[in-house]
Amino acid sequence: MKGLKRSRGNAMALAGAMVIAFSIAGCAPDTPVTATGEDPGQGTGGGPVTPDVSDQEVLDARRAAGIDECPTTDASGPVVEEGPAVEGGLPDLTLDCLGGDSTVRLASLRGPLIINVWAQWCGPCRAEAPYLAEFADTHPEVQMLGIDYADPRPGAAVAFADEADWDWPQLSDPDRSIAGPLKVVGPPHTVFVDADGRIVHVHAGPFTSTEQLEDLAAEHL
């Protein structure tokens, strides 16, 4: 993997300081924390989302960054099963893969799976990013899936995922369609899904260490 792996110690120390600095539980979309210093623009407050680049440019950037293709019945990554939604499972919603080259039906996903809802404009998301990357590095038995949420800049989102060393599949939800079904107040918001497709735990707000994420995965998955 790329990026943070080459300077993981410094990144982890910086992440710890950032988590302390961001003492809020997460980023409410109406009042986003902008770690880049840029105005996140429309979309984070419920208005229409105007992407910063075309789908093709996002797709090209995603593939250049080595981010995995989104899951299908024939692909590696989270297990997909055709059939009805599972009671207590993910909502029966279909989201685009970041880049628009495919779609994923959430209700078809099976675990063990961790779904992390994030946005490139969200400061706490950036703070927890190294912990997610380290967990994914050391726990290949747990599948990872991201959802870029309420984000008007998918191009910047791909750049963030690349810098964060996130190579797992990423979906896109610019219109916040998962907000109600998954009770997302704002990112980061993380959902744990078991092998039967049931939601077994939800963590609202940023992780403060890799160990915290490991403990939750061991307890619930």
Regions found by a protein language model. Give the residues of each.
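Short active-site neighborhood of thiol/selenol oxidoreductases, capturing the structured segment around
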Residues: 103-126, 132, 144
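Structural microenvironment flanking redox-active thiols in thiol-disulfide oxidoreductases
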Residues: 126-164, 174-180
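Bacterial N-terminal signal peptides that target proteins for export
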Residues: 3-15
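C-terminal motif of bacterial Sec signal peptides marking the signal peptidase cleavage site
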Residues: 22-26
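A short beta-strand-turn-helix
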Residues: 84-87, 92-113
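N-proximal helix/coil linker or "cap" segments that precede and/or mark the start of modular domains
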Residues: 35-92
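Thiol/disulfide oxidoreductase modules built on the thioredoxin-like
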Residues: 159-166, 173-221
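Bacterial signal peptide processing site
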Residues: 28-31, 123
